[in-house]
Amino acid sequence: MIEDVEITDNEFLRQFELEIGDNMARIEYALQDRKIFLTKYEMPEDLEDQGFRDIFIKAVFDEVRDRGISVMPTSPEVVGFL
């Protein structure tokens, strides 16, 4: 099901990743104290067209919330989600 996606936190590249087939979406971040700044959003058009944008961003927000970190969205796409 489309809502059941698994994201990965690639700490080395400082980005959350979502792989679907040969496509990868990513949200880059920067950590500062107990805040995470979501700075850049990239998603292949194929995934956007399939409705993965909101699902991916929500999954990232859920992951960050579970860690007890404040989210500071700076990417226009992430801000638009709110």
Regions found by a protein language model. Name each.
Residues 4, 24, 57-59:
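A generic local structural motif
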Residues 10-12, 32:
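Structural motif
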Residues 17-46:
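A short, structured beta-strand/loop element
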Residues 49-62:
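Conserved acetyl-CoA-binding loop-helix of GNAT-fold acetyltransferases
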Residues 62-77:
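Conserved GNAT acetyl-CoA-binding A-motif
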